[in-house]
Regions:
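Short hydrophobic alpha-helical segments enriched in small aliphatic residues
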Residues: 5-7
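NAD(P)+-binding Rossmann beta1-loop-alpha1 motif at the extreme N-terminus of oxidoreductases
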Residues: 24-91, 116, 153-156
Length: 173
C-alpha cells in the first residue's frame, strides 16, 4: 500500500542525552477518498491512490474527465449530490481545483456534508484563507485540512510531497 494512517504514538527516554523520543506506529490501510477536480494533478492523484489499492470516487464539472476515469475503473459521478451520496461516512473529500474556485465549490459542497466529514484543500490556496475556512467549518462539525501538494504530473510515478496543516483529528483520519 502506498498510503499509511497514523495508528498511535508512544514515548520513551532517549538513551543518548536523556531527551524524549516520540515513536510512531504506522499501519497500512485501504481507504476511500473522494476527489473533486480531475485536471492533470487531480486525475493523476486519483490514479496513484487507486493503483495503491484505495477506493477513489471522482467528480469534475467536466463530464469528459469523469468519463475517462470511469473507463479506468473509478466510481465516476456526474453531480456533487451523487458524489457525496456515493462516499461512505465519515467522508474524506480532496478538492484539487484552482484556488480561485475553492470558495464557490465549498458553498455548494458543504451543505451536502455531515458532521465528522473532512474536506482537504490540495490546491494552491493561500493558507490564511484555509485557516478562515477551517474556523468557519469547525462549528458545523466538518474538518478542514490544508494540504499543499507538490509533485506535478510526474507525481503519478514518483509520488507527491504533501505539506499538511489542520487539526490532529482530521489529519489522523
Amino acid at each position: 500500500m502506498s498510503l499509511h494512517v497514523h495508528a498511535g504514538t508512544n514515548s520513551r527516554t532517549c538513551p543518548v542525552g536523556g531527551g524524549t523520543l516520540l515513536m510512531t506506529a504506522w499501519q497500512a490501510v485501504v481507504m476511500q477518498l473522494g476527489m473533486i477536480g480531475l485536471g492533470r494533478m487531480g486525475a493523476n492523484m486519483a490514479r496513484r491512490l487507486q493503483h495503491g489499492g484505495h477506493d477513489c470516487v471522482v467528480y469534475d464539472v467536466n463530464a469528459d474527465a469523469v468519463t475517462a476515469l470511469a473507463e479506468e475503473g473509478f466510481a465516476g459521478t456526474t453531480t456533487l449530490e451523487e458524489f457525496v451520496a456515493t462516499l461512505d461516512t465519515p467522508r474524506s473529500i480532496w478538492v484539487m481545483i484552482p484556488a480561485a474556485f475553492v470558495s464557490e465549490m465549498l458553498d455548494v459542497l458543504v451543505p451536502l456534508l455531515d458532521t465528522d466529514d473532512t474536506v482537504i484543500d490540495g490546491g494552491n490556496s493561500w493558507y490564511r484563507l484555509d485557516v478562515d475556512r477551517a474556523k468557519e467549518l469547525t462549528p458545523k462539525g466538518i474538518h478542514y485540512v490544508d494540504v499543499g501538494t507538490s509533485g506535478g504530473v510526474a507525481g503519478l510515478e514518483r509520488g507527491y510531497s504533501l505539506m499538511i496543516g489542520g487539526g490532529d483529528t482530521a489529519i489522523g483520519r
